[in-house]
């Protein structure tokens, strides 16, 4: 018989930097999960990702306190900020532009994000990422 899922925990942890301090420790501790076991497994799986990149993770906690986790791709906003070379998006995106991204950069980000997007094809994924870029106050060229 399959194990019963007790809880889902959604966190955003930097790649290769999971440790028992907040936010990881308290979130897992309240469900009785072995925190160090998660940290070691997460850090091992994120070795191939650029250190410091935020990685969304969904942890499924079972009734016997065991767990599994699924990693997602880094947020589009993080990838867009890195591509545009900026620290943060605009506070007034419609009037104040803070950077530029071109179609090639959007395609690269869309390729990275494709597993997590609901887009049917690459062009739809690029348009989705372009919308995120505009909402952050970036000028989008070539879309």
Swiss-Prot record:
A GO cellular component entry from the record: cytosolic large ribosomal subunit
Annotated GO MF terms: large ribosomal subunit rRNA binding; structural constituent of ribosome
Domain of life: Bacteria
GO biological process: translation
Keyword line: Methylation, Ribonucleoprotein, Ribosomal protein, RNA-binding, rRNA-binding
Pfam name, any one: Ribosomal_L11
The keyword Membrane is assigned to this record: no
Annotated InterPro entries: Ribosomal_uL11, Ribosomal_uL11_bac-typ, Ribosomal_uL11_C, Ribosomal_uL11_C_sf, Ribosomal_uL11_N, Ribosomal_uL11_N_sf
Keyword check for Lyase: no
Post-translational modification as stated in the protein's UniProt record: One or more lysine residues are methylated.
Family under the similarity heading: Belongs to the universal ribosomal protein uL11 family.
Free-text function comment from the UniProt entry: Forms part of the ribosomal stalk which helps the ribosome interact with GTP-bound translation factors.
NCBIfam families: L11_bact
Subunit structure: Part of the ribosomal stalk of the 50S ribosomal subunit. Interacts with L10 and the large rRNA to form the base of the stalk. L10 forms an elongated spine to which L12 dimers bind in a sequential fashion forming a multimeric L10(L12)X complex.
Protein name: Large ribosomal subunit protein uL11
Organism: Teredinibacter turnerae (strain ATCC 39867 / T7901)
UniProt gene name: rplK
């Amino acid at each position: 018989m399959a194990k019963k899922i007790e809880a889902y925990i959604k966190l955003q942890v930097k790649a290769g930097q999971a440790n028992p301090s907040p936010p990881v420790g308290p979130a897992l501790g309240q469900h009785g999960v072995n925190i160090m076991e998660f940290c070691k497994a997460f850090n091992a799986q994120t070795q191939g990702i650029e250190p410091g990149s935020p990685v969304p993770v969904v942890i499924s906690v079972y009734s016997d306190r065991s767990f599994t986790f699924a990693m997602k791709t880094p947020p589009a906003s993080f990838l867009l900020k890195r591509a545009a070379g900026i620290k943060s998006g605009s506070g007034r995106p419609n009037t104040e532009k803070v950077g530029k991204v071109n179609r090639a950069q959007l395609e690269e980000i869309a390729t990275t994000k494709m597993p997590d997007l609901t887009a049917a094809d690459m062009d739809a994924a690029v348009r989705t990422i372009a919308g995120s870029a505009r909402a952050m106050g970036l000028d989008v060229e070539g879309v």
